[in-house]
């Protein structure tokens, strides 16, 4: 039981970039935020920046790295003179199969039972990279993925933390003959992700955009440009 006043506290984790403008100050707690886009669009850089800002505030991050994209050197660049603090605050899981991904989430839940007060962020980068059809059919995958997302949301709510997932994209052809981008996982991941941000590559070198595709109380369709720089994102 809790007071409504406490549930309304605006305690977000900032990216310290222009992306915060469309998110209302940063990534929300007690929900799942999904960043999706093509390779190189900035998904992992955003999660690294969130982990650094979490450490700057004296809290831990659990980082489930399914693609091998978590670079110690990149974290060192973004962290600057607080690298040692950041390195001590990030707990990393590196699953090599979709089954191990589920086990990593279970172990994260067990970790939070004793470290929930000191942990503010759980990252799953990315949510579906490890799935292969040979591991099972689509219906069993959806069932397993739904269970994983349910567990992740339970962690966010029970321990008052932010849960962030990244996702890949694929192109679909609409009835009008035009190509559209859609995140992998379709309606299932959309159901669990109450905040969704699409990352786009611009036409000019280094140009990127973030578009708010789903949010409970922010203007959907809001779009900002951002850049990946040596010490993070702007």
Swiss-Prot record:
InterPro entries reported for this sequence: AAA+_ATPase (IPR003593), DNA_recomb/repair_Rad51_C (IPR013632), DNA_repair_and_recomb_RadB (IPR011939), P-loop_NTPase (IPR027417), RecA_ATP-bd (IPR020588)
Xref: CDD domains: archRadB (cd01394)
GO molecular function per UniProt: ATP binding; ATP hydrolysis activity; ATP-dependent DNA damage sensor activity; damaged DNA binding
Keywords: ATP-binding, DNA damage, DNA recombination, DNA-binding, Nucleotide-binding
Any one of the GO BP annotations: DNA recombination
Chain positions recorded as ATP binding sites: 37-44
Stated family: Belongs to the eukaryotic RecA-like protein family. RadB subfamily.
Cited function: Involved in DNA repair and in homologous recombination. May regulate the cleavage reactions of the branch-structured DNA. Has a very weak ATPase activity that is not stimulated by DNA. Binds DNA but does not promote DNA strands exchange.
Annotated NCBIfam families: recomb_radB
Protein name according to UniProt: DNA repair and recombination protein RadB
Organism: Methanothermobacter thermautotrophicus (strain ATCC 29096 / DSM 1053 / JCM 10044 / NBRC 100330 / Delta H)
Gene name of the record: radB
């Amino acid at each position: 039981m809790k007071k409504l006043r406490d549930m309304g506290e605006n305690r977000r984790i900032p990216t310290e970039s222009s992306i915060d403008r469309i998110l209302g100050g940063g990534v929300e707690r007690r929900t799942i935020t999904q960043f999706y886009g093509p390779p190189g669009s900035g998904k992992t850089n955003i999660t690294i920046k969130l982990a650094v800002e979490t450490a700057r505030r004296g809290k831990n991050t659990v980082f489930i790295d399914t693609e091998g994209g978590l670079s110690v050197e990149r974290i060192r660049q973004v962290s600057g003179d607080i690298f040692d603090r950041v390195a001590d605050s990030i707990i990393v899981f590196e699953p090599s199969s979709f089954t191990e991904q589920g086990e990593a989430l279970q172990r994260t839940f067990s970790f939070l039972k004793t470290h929930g007060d000191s942990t503010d962020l759980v990252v799953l980068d990315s949510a579906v990279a490890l799935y292969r059809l040979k591991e099972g059919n689509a219906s069993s995958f959806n069932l397993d993925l739904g269970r994983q997302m349910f567990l992740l949301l339970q962690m966010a709510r029970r321990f008052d933390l932010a849960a962030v997932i990244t996702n890949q994209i694929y192109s679909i052809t609409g009835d009008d003959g035009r190509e559209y981008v859609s995140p992998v996982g379709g309606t299932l991941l959309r159901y669990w992700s109450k905040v969704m941000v699409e990352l786009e590559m611009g036409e000019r070198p280094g140009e990127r955009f973030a578009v708010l595709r789903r949010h409970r109380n922010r203007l959907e369709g809001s779009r900002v440009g951002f850049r990946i720089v040596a010490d993070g994102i702007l």
